[in-house]
Amino acid sequence: MKKLLCICMIMMSCISAFGQASVSNVAIPEPEFNGDAFICNLSANTYVKAEKAIGQMKTKDQFWGPERKLYVKPSKSSVRVKKGHIQFIIRVPNINDDPYSFIKISKFSAGSTRKLSLARQNELSGKVTYGGKNKQELFFEAKKYGASSLLIDADIEKPGEYCIMISNPNRVDGKIPVSCFGIDE
């Protein structure tokens, strides 16, 4: 009986050691909270957390119709990366939802604050355009990463201030959390 117990203990310690080794093989962990984003380099196993900011949404009545804009202070992000191919790991509420329906990568219009045109409605035609007249939204590709995150690939060539926004239809106030970063030459 003691031999059987000893063999079981050895097997359990081996399984435990193997389980810990497989967890440590994960190069880049998933972000902790929904909406958090890591800017990562998977080939070098490095990452940096994107700046988390709370944007204030305001609606302005323009000549051509109402326009919703998102304002974020300060005017520049503290997180800077080089232009080119960029990968993000973003934690999402439901990994099985279509990422193109609720994730937006957008370029800010930078001045004293960072601002982003969310939607504009034309009074005459009733047409609603998203991303503003200068097409601030960027194309990306998405894949599942881990248990509750997505790996986002985007090619960003223009220097400036950018954000990743996860839309939440249940939000009732005018504050929107965004993950911000800046692109340098």
Residue ranges of each PLM-predicted region?
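Sec-dependent N-terminal signal peptides
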Residues: 4-13
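Positively charged n-region of N-terminal signal peptides that target proteins for export
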Residues: 1-4, 19-20
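Primarily secretory-pathway and cell-envelope proteins
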Residues: 20-126, 168-185
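Extended, solvent-exposed segments with strong compositional bias
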Residues: 119-147
